Amino acid sequence: MPFRSNNPITRDELLSRFFPQFHPVTTFNSGLSGGSFLIEHQGQRFVVRQPHDPDAPQSAFLHQYRALSQLPACIAPKPHLYLRDWMVVDYLPGEVKTYLPDTNELAGLLYYLHQQPRFGWRITLLPLLELYWQQSDPARRTVGWLRMLKRLRKAREPRPLRLSPLHMDVHAGNLVHSASGLKLIDWEYAGDGDIALELAAVWVENTEQHRQLVNDYATRAKIYPAQLWRQVRRWFPWLLMLKAGWFEYRWRQTGDQQFIRLADDTWRQLLIKQ
């Protein structure tokens, strides 16, 4: 249920107007992040979400709502309310683990997602890379960073192998191990893109695990594993630049030192892979 309003409302106003019988579950935070919190009434639970990035355009949050509205409930939470700065979705019971599931199981989930109808908006990385450069701390902008940005701009993004709806933030913390199977949460980066971009972006533990995931996916998708792996590798420089730029952007936005450490580590990976 989308609800149009140009006037932001508070958390208390949201609950009293739309969920008067629900109350926040203050002692529960499993699988929740950002400004999310859980509400409950007679055993029914919803997650109340806000945009993770307060400076992101409102369209990004609306895209997330639209993606969840068309995805099947077997892989994603169903949304119940959208309005400015707030979204209410189903709570997915299950376990959020600290490590990825078996690669074949994860490949099955991603392949099923990629068989769904496209969302209707494309994921393009270059505008994000340029935004993160512009919004980063000027003292952190280096000649090497600018050189790599220009190199990617000239090369252009790899041509998609297959264009499908993507989640684009697949890691252990966004996977719910439920009684009915694996499900994905936090769809804020979802959009249409290359299946190899999704596979390249999975937060794996090592190259061996990554290769196995790609091989398992290739078997399901009837693609030669070597062909799919080559396409995944074409996206690596783009994704490393995306991660480094995002960490730099978040450092300037929050002042949190962890983002500097993550950015420095990603820059080192970029130098190694050049």
From Swiss-Prot:
Family named by the database record: Belongs to the thiamine kinase family.
Domain of life: Bacteria
Keyword annotations from UniProtKB, A to Z: ATP-binding, Kinase, Nucleotide-binding, Transferase
Molecular function as annotated in GO: ATP binding; thiamine kinase activity
Keyword DNA-binding assigned: no
InterPro entries (UniProt xref): Aminoglycoside_PTrfase (IPR002575), Kinase-like_dom_sf (IPR011009), Thiamine_kinase (IPR014093)
Record EC number: 2.7.1.89
Catalytic activity: thiamine + ATP = thiamine phosphate + ADP + H(+)
BP GO terms, sorted: thiamine diphosphate biosynthetic process; thiamine metabolic process
Pathway assigned to this chain's UniProt record: Cofactor biosynthesis; thiamine diphosphate biosynthesis; thiamine phosphate from thiamine: step 1/1
Identification of the protein by name: Thiamine kinase
One Pfam entry name: APH
First-level EC class: transferase
Signal peptide as annotated in the record: none
Stated role: Catalyzes the ATP-dependent phosphorylation of thiamine to thiamine phosphate. Is involved in thiamine salvage.
